[in-house]
Amino acid sequence: MNGGMSSTFSTEAGGPGAWIAPLAAGLPELGELDLGQLHRFDAALRDLRVRFPIDAGVQPALRSERLLRIRHELAASGHLAAAVATCDGGCGRPGLVQTMMQFICGYHDIDLRDATGLGHGRLIASYASAAVRDQWLPRLLGGALAGIAITEAHGGSQVHATTTAAVPRRDGSWAVSGTKSSISRLDEAAVFCVFFKDPAGHLTAGVVDAGAAGLRRRPVTPAGLSGWAWGELHLDGVRLRQRDILARPGTGMDLVREHFAHYRPLVAATALGAAAAACDSVAAHLGTREKAGFITAPRDNALITLGRAYAQINAAMLAALTAQRLSEACDEGASLWGCAAKAHGVDVAYAAASELALLAGAPGFAADSQLAKARRDLNGLLYADGIHDSLYRAVGRTLTVTAGLRRPDARVPLPRIAQDQQSNFMPGTGPWARDQVTGQPPSNEITVPALIASTHAAIRRASSGITRSAT
């Protein structure tokens, strides 16, 4: 139950809590323990930002160093692993806790997007061999960072066209060579999850120590998202043992789909947190100007812009939370929702921050302004982890491919509670009823499992190859 959430996250306190409290009212998965965790995390992050400033004026190298320090501090205080599964060494809180933590991180600074959780290290937790898990999970839970290397010069939306390839060695291992582009955490990552073509020509993923022989880096200065080093990762005969393969050879595309179905809603939540901060900052700015007598009252167009941003940010956040729920449930629609939630969430966040910046006046466009930095970072997120037009295209393709499988006269299934109530009074009826002889659903019904089964292959085809590794 989360009925007492207001005592944990007061809407009067401002900050991310004022946004999270009403959202949490519709999330029965989050209890008082979780809301208390989020409140303490927000307070810890505020304190760490004072101790280790990462504002827009801080030099990139120093910001990177401080961001890693913040991650290690959060690991030591128990925040990093709050929503990591217990089987992976974490506290096992609901996955939506991580989504909310990402929102809080974005509210403070998008560069804090890797402050908690396993990030791309989740691939290691979920698919690595026992030996590799034992090698890396303790380090990741202790604050080490995992990077991902998918994108190449031809772009990140064509994973099937990967040219990085492995050749067999005499000792049974593989030698991987190629160049990965737009790689974030270039210098900070302790380990990389690298995608390449195996000797049979199939997309495969493996775990590569950041200190492995044959790795070379070429940094590139990004226009935003500059908290971590960014650039090219060159692999020249990097040795990969059988135990280093994620899942099994040839499953690379499946790993991409599953991982980013989980990861993209987190990106959306981070972006929306930054937009929420911009909304609060501009509202406070207008209030200050009114109290000082510089304006008699905010103009209608300013109030409309604030109100529209508030509505859109909350709506997009609800979509991101739904996408995360589907991912946690291993729902077949998780990849589709992940694409839509990330693209829409970042679009909303970027548009809101851009429009709100106009209300802040000249200070909002200073290079060292946090609002200006948020706009630069949000612009970067339009491309990172799936460029928005490719994600929208994947969603549209899925909808057109599966349209013929959806009957327009199909009944909408009742909510589970309503189903239970109905079955108590009318046994054998309702959208989940089954024929007493065949045990099958009535012929005039479409059940969710049946729809999922019929659309699974279409969704997999339509969403293939849609990713990017810039964050």
Please give the residue ranges for each predicted region.
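A short core secondary-structure module
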Residues: 173, 179-216
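Glycine-rich beta->alpha junctions and the first turn(s) of the following alpha-helix
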Residues: 220-314, 426, 430, 452
